[in-house]
A protein has these predicted regions:
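Pepsin/retropepsin-fold aspartyl endopeptidases
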Residues: 1-127
Length: 127
């Protein structure tokens, strides 16, 4: 499910470690901000990353921000539960992050229709 929250596009999702079966949140979903400038799959807060993926060896990656600054992320491959779809991709975190952020790698499987006049959002799978 997707929404506009204060004119910000968000999607409802849950994150799962495919190796341990741990899911966050345990019940329900969280809002993740849609960021079309982020080319990755999913950014999550550090405490959630530790809760779900602490047993796995993480990989470091460099992220380049729009202003040219560079950040180092760490991540692992995980799953996103989005409605009835299960999507696999690189789930990462950066220091100080306190929200969930979806990127192009996750969104490329969907058609997104946003109508700010009607305050409506439709998210539909490509297939």
């Amino acid at each position: 499910m997707s929404h506009l929250v204060d004119h910000t596009l968000v999607v409802e999702l849950a994150v799962r470690n495919p190796f341990t079966g741990k899911v966050f949140p345990r019940n329900g979903t969280v809002f993740a901000v849609v960021d079309t400038g982020y080319e990755g799959f999913l950014l999550i807060p550090g405490d959630v990353f530790e809760e779900l993926f602490s047993e796995l060896e993480s990989e470091k990656r460099e992220l380049i921000l729009a202003d040219g600054r560079k950040l180092i992320s760490r991540g692992v491959y995980g799953e996103v539960l989005l409605g009835r779809k299960v999507l696999e991709g690189f789930v990462e975190t950066i220091e100080g992050l306190d929200e969930f952020v979806t990127g192009i790698d996750l969104l490329k499987s969907f058609r997104i229709e946003v109508d700010y006049c009607l305050k409506s959002v439709r998210l539909k799978g490509c297939r």
